Amino acid sequence: MARPTRRPVVELRRISKLYGGGATLVRALDAVDLVVEHGDYVAVMGASGSGKSTLMNIIGCLDVPSSGRYLLDGVDIRRLDDRQQAAVRNRKIGFIFQSFNLIPRTTAVANVELPLAYAGVRPVERRRRALAALGRVGIAERAGNLPSQLSGGQQQRVAIARAIVTDPVLLLADEPTGALDSRSTADLLALFDGFNADGRTVLVITHEPDVAAHAKRVLRMRDGKIVSDGRVAAPTDRPPQWSGAAARARVAAGKRR
């Protein structure tokens, strides 16, 4: 008996987002079609005003399209009310932003626990999973520290641990390296490479070619449209430092930075 076909993580069908009206009408997105399969690694590039941030907000269920259809892991988002959308967003998407969005007077491990608390996970299980996520990003020894006691790179790792703690189907990152130095940027990209090598779907919004170079697929946007969509080097053609094992080793070696 044939196995059922798995639905894509992201399916956008003629998604448009309009602001204003009449002479002031702005098409932030204009009939965008996009499919992202499980295990893909996609970078979205474009100048300011190209529509990439609006696209991220709709994929992340932070905004609703003016028209079109959006399925997230097979779930038709337009059929959900606000409460249901929030639950799906918390369970299926891990967000990583340029600003780390950590609660200042809350420890690293408690910050990571937050999505699990919203999902109703019991405290003991929350703590176990949060510590495991911090270990996955190489910063378990800082679990009891406040954000003010961590470097920028360490704070970003805490934010990444929080993003993966619910085991989401999609990691969605918006300019994740914007507040990092070059060393922390390299470590963050090594984490993304490792996550994707382990089968996790990653979508990154960026204007930096060096960040996009880590993806398997690069989209370019202009005036609310996807104007190019191309595959890059196959995984077997990539440098060996991009493998999952090598990425984990790199993070482990630099975990005290």
State each model region's role.
Residues 7-215, 220-221, 226:
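ABC family nucleotide-binding domain
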